[in-house]
Curated annotation (Swiss-Prot):
Localization (cell): Cytoplasm
Cofactor: Fe cation
Annotated thermal dependence: Optimum temperature is 90-96 degrees Celsius. Highly thermostable.
Main location, first listed in the record: cytoplasm
Listed EC numbers: 5.3.1.9
Gene that encodes the chain: pgiA
pH behavior: Optimum pH is 7.0.
Organism in which the protein naturally occurs: Pyrococcus furiosus (strain ATCC 43587 / DSM 3638 / JCM 8422 / Vc1)
Cellular-component GO terms for this entry: cytoplasm
Regulation: Inhibited by mannose 6-phosphate, fructose 1-phosphate and fructose 1,6-bisphosphate.
Top-level EC class: isomerase
PANTHER family (UniProt xref): CUPIN TYPE-2 DOMAIN-CONTAINING PROTEIN, OXALATE-BINDING PROTEIN
Residues that, per the record, bind Fe cation: H88, H90, E97, H136
Name under which the protein is recorded: Glucose-6-phosphate isomerase
Length: 189
Protein backbone atom coordinates (compact mmCIF):
# COMPACT_ATOMS: atom_id res chain seq x y z
CA UNK A 1 0.00 0.00 0.00
CA UNK A 2 1.25 3.45 -0.90
CA UNK A 3 1.37 6.35 1.47
CA UNK A 4 -1.06 9.14 0.54
CA UNK A 5 0.51 12.38 -0.78
CA UNK A 6 -0.71 15.60 0.81
CA UNK A 7 -0.31 19.35 0.70
CA UNK A 8 -0.58 21.95 3.45
CA UNK A 9 -0.56 25.74 3.57
CA UNK A 10 2.36 27.60 5.14
CA UNK A 11 1.75 31.23 6.07
CA UNK A 12 5.07 32.93 5.28
CA UNK A 13 4.07 35.99 7.34
CA UNK A 14 3.31 34.10 10.57
CA UNK A 15 5.19 30.82 10.05
CA UNK A 16 2.08 28.79 10.90
CA UNK A 17 1.55 25.49 9.05
CA UNK A 18 -2.09 24.43 9.03
CA UNK A 19 -2.72 21.30 11.11
CA UNK A 20 0.88 21.11 12.35
CA UNK A 21 1.99 20.10 15.83
CA UNK A 22 2.96 23.27 17.71
CA UNK A 23 5.62 23.48 20.40
CA UNK A 24 6.69 26.57 22.32
CA UNK A 25 10.06 27.32 23.94
CA UNK A 26 10.13 30.00 26.60
CA UNK A 27 13.30 31.52 27.99
CA UNK A 28 12.81 29.47 31.18
CA UNK A 29 13.14 26.31 29.03
CA UNK A 30 16.67 27.38 28.08
CA UNK A 31 18.45 27.48 31.43
CA UNK A 32 22.21 27.16 30.99
CA UNK A 33 22.20 27.99 27.27
CA UNK A 34 23.02 31.72 27.48
CA UNK A 35 26.40 32.99 28.69
CA UNK A 36 25.04 35.80 30.90
CA UNK A 37 23.19 33.77 33.53
CA UNK A 38 22.28 36.82 35.60
CA UNK A 39 20.63 38.54 32.62
CA UNK A 40 18.84 35.26 31.80
CA UNK A 41 17.47 34.96 35.35
CA UNK A 42 16.32 38.60 35.46
CA UNK A 43 14.50 38.28 32.13
CA UNK A 44 12.84 35.00 33.15
CA UNK A 45 11.64 36.50 36.44
CA UNK A 46 10.45 39.69 34.75
CA UNK A 47 8.48 38.22 31.82
CA UNK A 48 9.74 34.76 30.69
CA UNK A 49 9.28 35.58 26.99
CA UNK A 50 8.59 33.06 24.24
CA UNK A 51 11.90 32.63 22.40
CA UNK A 52 10.56 30.45 19.57
CA UNK A 53 7.68 28.34 18.32
CA UNK A 54 7.89 25.30 16.05
CA UNK A 55 5.14 24.04 13.73
CA UNK A 56 6.06 20.48 12.70
CA UNK A 57 4.59 18.02 10.22
CA UNK A 58 6.19 14.71 11.11
CA UNK A 59 6.07 11.30 9.50
CA UNK A 60 6.78 7.87 10.89
CA UNK A 61 10.46 7.61 11.90
CA UNK A 62 11.70 5.53 9.00
CA UNK A 63 14.45 5.80 6.44
CA UNK A 64 13.45 7.51 3.21
CA UNK A 65 10.68 9.70 4.62
CA UNK A 66 10.84 13.44 5.31
CA UNK A 67 9.63 15.76 8.06
CA UNK A 68 9.24 19.50 7.70
CA UNK A 69 8.70 22.32 10.15
CA UNK A 70 8.66 26.07 10.42
CA UNK A 71 10.21 27.94 13.30
CA UNK A 72 9.25 31.43 14.42
CA UNK A 73 12.26 32.78 16.32
CA UNK A 74 11.39 36.00 18.11
CA UNK A 75 13.71 39.01 18.42
CA UNK A 76 15.44 39.64 21.71
CA UNK A 77 18.67 39.35 23.64
CA UNK A 78 19.94 37.94 26.90
CA UNK A 79 22.69 40.36 27.84
CA UNK A 80 24.51 40.91 24.54
CA UNK A 81 23.55 37.50 23.13
CA UNK A 82 20.78 37.31 20.52
CA UNK A 83 17.86 34.89 20.97
CA UNK A 84 18.55 31.50 19.38
CA UNK A 85 17.13 28.00 19.12
CA UNK A 86 18.55 25.36 21.46
CA UNK A 87 20.48 23.78 18.61
CA UNK A 88 21.16 20.11 18.04
CA UNK A 89 23.08 17.37 16.32
CA UNK A 90 21.00 14.70 14.64
CA UNK A 91 20.69 11.48 16.66
CA UNK A 92 21.74 9.77 13.42
CA UNK A 93 24.76 11.97 12.78
CA UNK A 94 24.96 11.09 9.07
CA UNK A 95 21.66 12.86 8.28
CA UNK A 96 21.60 16.25 6.51
CA UNK A 97 18.98 19.02 6.61
CA UNK A 98 17.88 21.99 4.50
CA UNK A 99 16.69 25.34 5.87
CA UNK A 100 14.89 28.05 3.87
CA UNK A 101 14.59 31.56 5.32
CA UNK A 102 11.08 32.97 4.81
CA UNK A 103 10.98 36.22 6.79
CA UNK A 104 13.20 38.37 8.97
CA UNK A 105 16.93 38.48 9.45
CA UNK A 106 19.04 35.87 11.15
CA UNK A 107 21.62 33.24 10.60
CA UNK A 108 22.75 29.75 11.32
CA UNK A 109 25.59 28.77 13.58
CA UNK A 110 26.98 25.36 12.62
CA UNK A 111 29.60 23.28 14.39
CA UNK A 112 31.44 19.99 13.95
CA UNK A 113 31.74 17.60 16.91
CA UNK A 114 35.29 18.97 17.41
CA UNK A 115 34.00 22.55 17.71
CA UNK A 116 34.93 23.98 14.30
CA UNK A 117 32.21 26.59 13.74
CA UNK A 118 30.72 28.38 10.75
CA UNK A 119 28.24 31.29 10.60
CA UNK A 120 25.89 31.68 7.62
CA UNK A 121 23.76 34.84 7.37
CA UNK A 122 20.13 34.29 6.38
CA UNK A 123 17.44 36.54 4.93
CA UNK A 124 14.28 35.67 2.95
CA UNK A 125 15.24 33.37 0.10
CA UNK A 126 18.46 32.05 1.66
CA UNK A 127 18.74 28.25 1.54
CA UNK A 128 21.21 26.63 3.93
CA UNK A 129 22.45 23.08 3.49
CA UNK A 130 23.39 21.48 6.82
CA UNK A 131 25.76 18.60 6.04
CA UNK A 132 25.80 15.37 8.04
CA UNK A 133 27.69 15.52 11.36
CA UNK A 134 27.17 19.28 11.90
CA UNK A 135 25.27 20.68 14.91
CA UNK A 136 23.14 23.66 13.99
CA UNK A 137 21.37 26.53 15.73
CA UNK A 138 19.50 29.50 14.27
CA UNK A 139 19.86 33.03 15.63
CA UNK A 140 17.57 36.06 15.21
CA UNK A 141 19.74 39.15 14.66
CA UNK A 142 16.86 41.41 13.58
CA UNK A 143 14.01 43.29 15.21
CA UNK A 144 11.13 41.17 13.86
CA UNK A 145 10.42 37.43 13.98
CA UNK A 146 12.90 35.34 11.98
CA UNK A 147 10.89 32.61 10.25
CA UNK A 148 12.33 29.63 8.39
CA UNK A 149 11.33 26.23 7.01
CA UNK A 150 13.38 23.11 7.76
CA UNK A 151 13.22 19.84 5.81
CA UNK A 152 14.94 16.80 7.27
CA UNK A 153 14.92 12.97 7.21
CA UNK A 154 12.14 11.51 9.35
CA UNK A 155 14.63 9.15 11.01
CA UNK A 156 17.27 11.83 11.79
CA UNK A 157 16.23 12.35 15.40
CA UNK A 158 17.47 15.20 17.60
CA UNK A 159 20.39 15.15 20.02
CA UNK A 160 19.84 18.23 22.19
CA UNK A 161 21.80 16.80 25.11
CA UNK A 162 25.27 17.28 23.65
CA UNK A 163 24.63 20.99 23.05
CA UNK A 164 22.94 21.41 26.46
CA UNK A 165 26.06 19.93 28.07
CA UNK A 166 28.85 21.49 25.97
CA UNK A 167 27.25 24.45 24.21
CA UNK A 168 28.52 25.87 20.92
CA UNK A 169 32.13 27.02 20.54
CA UNK A 170 30.90 30.42 19.28
CA UNK A 171 28.13 32.81 20.33
CA UNK A 172 26.43 35.60 18.40
CA UNK A 173 26.31 38.97 20.16
CA UNK A 174 25.60 42.62 19.54
CA UNK A 175 28.52 44.89 20.36
CA UNK A 176 28.58 48.61 19.55
CA UNK A 177 25.56 48.13 17.26
CA UNK A 178 27.26 45.37 15.25
CA UNK A 179 26.58 41.64 15.02
CA UNK A 180 29.66 39.67 16.05
CA UNK A 181 30.43 35.96 16.20
CA UNK A 182 32.84 35.45 19.11
CA UNK A 183 34.33 32.61 21.15
CA UNK A 184 32.04 31.15 23.81
CA UNK A 185 33.92 31.46 27.12
CA UNK A 186 31.92 28.52 28.54
CA UNK A 187 32.39 26.06 25.68
CA UNK A 188 33.56 22.59 26.72
CA UNK A 189 35.54 20.46 24.25
Amino acid sequence: MYKEPFGVKVDFETGIIEGAKKSVRRLSDMEGYFVDERAWKELVEKEDPVVYEVYAVEQEEKEGDLNFATTVLYPGKVGKEFFFTKGHFHAKLDRAEVYVALKGKGGMLLQTPEGDAKWISMEPGTVVYVPPYWAHRTVNIGDEPFIFLAIYPADAGHDYGTIAEKGFSKIVIEENGEVKVVDNPRWKK
